[in-house]
Amino acid sequence: MSSLGRAAIPRFFLLSRGADNELYEAWREAIKEVAPASVHDKFELLRADLKELPAKKITVDCVVSPANSYGIMDGGYDLALSLMFKGKGKEGEKTLTRHCQAALREKWAGYLPPSSCMLMPIPAEVENPLKAKVLAVLPTMRIPEDASWNRDLVYNSMWALLNAIRTHGAPLESVLLTGLGTGTGYVSPKRCAAQMMLAVKHFVEGIPENGTWNDVMPVALEVDKTFKL
């Protein structure tokens, strides 16, 4: 077993809107019941709107956009990110979208499949109250739509994020993340939280080296058990 260990996990700020008690409680339970005890202190739950974070003096290295595959950041949480990290001028809220789409064109020919992850620098010219260095573009859907049919969407997305952070050239020690697919995607908070923490668990513990089906099936079956949540 090739274990990456505690060091593979950055500090996560998990953000749920003030009124979204269900996601907050689902995260709290999943951290306790699913995530390895060695990384429990890596997660801080925040019940607030994104725009309230600067007043709390929270800063992070990386902000995650659980976006669509085309990098259009004009709705929901992505719009809140666009407004927080806005450029100058009348169309300043489009600056983040334009930089995101330029990076997508360069690295992915303009389309990032769901559950893939691309890291890009936060543009120097935008407002940056969180002092973030990197935007993690992490599509949970091709276009804004119900994604609840995609049973292991959150697990795959969280794994992609963790691995992108692991392989990034410079250390990313703190990450701001909201629910994956729980808005427009209609993924249930319980499934989202369970799959996020399962991905963390399996990432920390490592996938068996030279594994057989006997080795990997217990890992896969743990994910399968979340499908009905």
Regions found by a protein language model. Give the residues of each.
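Macrodomain-like recognition of ADP-ribose-binding/processing modules
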Residues: 1-229
